[in-house]
Amino acid sequence: MLTNKRLQNFVIHASDGDLGYVHELYFDDETWTIRYLNIDTGGWLGGRRVLISPFSIIRTAWDALRLDVALTKKQVEDSPDIDTHRPVSRQHEAAYLGYFGFPYYWGGPFLWGTAYYPSGVAVSDASSAETLADRVGRESADSHLRSTGAVTGYHIEAADGEIGHVDGFVVDDETWAIRYIEVDTRKWLPGKKVLVPPAWIEGVSWTDSKVRVGLSREAVKEAPEYDEFVPMTREYENRLYLHYGRPPYWLHDAEPASPYALSGV
């Protein structure tokens, strides 16, 4: 498990050198899975920000705070230029994925289309598939991508009132699913942080910056405290799910992904 805060210290290393460091993450708001890492390339690309898909990640070097990717610097330099300061459309995603020969993650029943893990998806020769123009033309404009930076600070509302705000995200570095939202309750419960799985979200108002969860404030108050500086253990996760009386995610990990109820305005 990794937090988005820790990932922001990671360097992205290509086969022929460093690409830059992680600036923030993009996730889709239907399955709450990280789809891209927004990379600050520093000076070698004139300050250009580029996107890196988990499809390309081959190793996590924990001690070195580094993610190794199966790409070259030239590939990244020649990749479609996406303005990361504006919403990323599905057409932009299709152009990006097509350039690298990656499949569409939205084209199957699992988190990564035909596979549960991005590492289990084969890279294809884009030239052997249908033309990019045809592929892009069939895609909708909205890709449901949100950045961790933009959603941090959203208010969290329980069934009976506000309980805190989004302070971070805990990410599974194998599936790249967001396992937990880190909730800072210090304005209501001084000094305490707790975790809430995205599956328990009942709705999000993107215009009002609010996340509604199907929990009571009392349930959150009595939940096991979360310490972001202590490594996540299965024992802690078990205590969390036992407290809430809900089945853990690992009991249905291999099942086809079904979008969480995240309708909002």
Label for each model-derived stretch:
Residues 1-265:
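Peripheral interaction segments used for macromolecular assembly
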